[in-house]
C-alpha cells in the first residue's frame, strides 16, 4: 500500500479547497450578474402591473442628453454668443485701429493651422 506523507496530503487538500473556493466565487459572481440583468429586463418590460420596485427603477433611470436638449431652449445662449463676436471681413479692415490698452496700432494675426506642427 502506498502511503502519502501527511505534509503532502495536507498541501493537496489545501490546494483543492482553494480551487473549489475560487470556482464557487466565480460561479456566484456570474450568477449574481446574470440575475441582476434578467431582473432589470423583466421589470422594465412588465407593463401590466406597476410595482414599487418598477416605480423606483423608473425614477432613477438615466435620461439621454438628446432628450434633455430637446426639452431645453438654447436660444438665449446662441443670441448672446452671436452678439459678442464681431466678425470682420478683409475689406473692412483698414489697419488704422488703435489698441486702447497699449496705444499702438493693432496688427492682424493670421489664423489657421500652425505651420510648425506637421
UniProtKB/Swiss-Prot annotation:
<feature type="signal peptide">
    <location>
        <begin position="1"/>
        <end position="35"/>
    </location>
</feature>
<feature type="glycosylation site" description="O-linked (Ara...) hydroxyproline">
    <location>
        <position position="113"/>
    </location>
</feature>
<feature type="modified residue" description="Hydroxyproline">
    <location>
        <position position="110"/>
    </location>
</feature>
<keyword id="KW-0325">Glycoprotein</keyword>
<keyword id="KW-0964">Secreted</keyword>
<dbReference type="InterPro" id="IPR039618">
    <property type="entry name" value="CLE9-13"/>
</dbReference>
<protein>
    <recommendedName>
        <fullName>CLAVATA3/ESR (CLE)-related protein 12</fullName>
    </recommendedName>
</protein>
<feature type="compositionally biased region" description="Basic and acidic residues">
    <location>
        <begin position="98"/>
        <end position="108"/>
    </location>
</feature>
<keyword id="KW-0732">Signal</keyword>
<comment type="similarity">
    <text>Belongs to the CLV3/ESR signal peptide family.</text>
</comment>
<keyword id="KW-0217">Developmental protein</keyword>
<feature type="modified residue" description="Hydroxyproline">
    <location>
        <position position="113"/>
    </location>
</feature>
<keyword id="KW-0221">Differentiation</keyword>
<dbReference type="GO" id="GO:0048046">
    <property type="term" value="C:apoplast"/>
</dbReference>
<feature type="compositionally biased region" description="Basic and acidic residues">
    <location>
        <begin position="75"/>
        <end position="91"/>
    </location>
</feature>
<feature type="region of interest" description="Disordered">
    <location>
        <begin position="75"/>
        <end position="118"/>
    </location>
</feature>
<dbReference type="GO" id="GO:0033612">
    <property type="term" value="F:receptor serine/threonine kinase binding"/>
</dbReference>
<dbReference type="GO" id="GO:0045168">
    <property type="term" value="P:cell-cell signaling involved in cell fate commitment"/>
</dbReference>
<keyword id="KW-0379">Hydroxylation</keyword>
Amino acid at each position: 500500500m502506498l502511503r502519502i506523507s501527511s505534509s503532502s496530503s495536507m498541501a493537496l487538500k489545501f490546494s483543492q479547497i482553494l480551487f473549489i473556493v475560487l470556482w464557487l466565487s466565480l460561479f456566484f459572481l456570474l450568477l449574481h450578474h446574470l440575475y441582476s440583468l434578467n431582473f432589470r429586463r423583466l421589470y422594465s418590460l412588465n407593463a401590466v402591473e406597476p410595482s414599487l420596485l418598477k416605480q423606483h427603477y423608473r425614477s432613477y433611470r438615466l435620461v439621454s442628453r438628446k432628450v434633455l436638449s430637446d426639452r431645453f431652449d438654447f436660444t438665449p445662449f446662441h443670441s448672446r454668443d452671436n452678439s459678442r463676436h464681431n466678425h470682420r471681413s478683409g475689406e473692412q479692415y483698414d489697419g488704422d485701429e488703435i489698441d486702447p490698452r497699449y496705444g499702438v496700432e493693432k496688427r492682424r494675426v493670421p489664423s489657421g493651422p500652425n505651420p510648425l506642427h506637421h
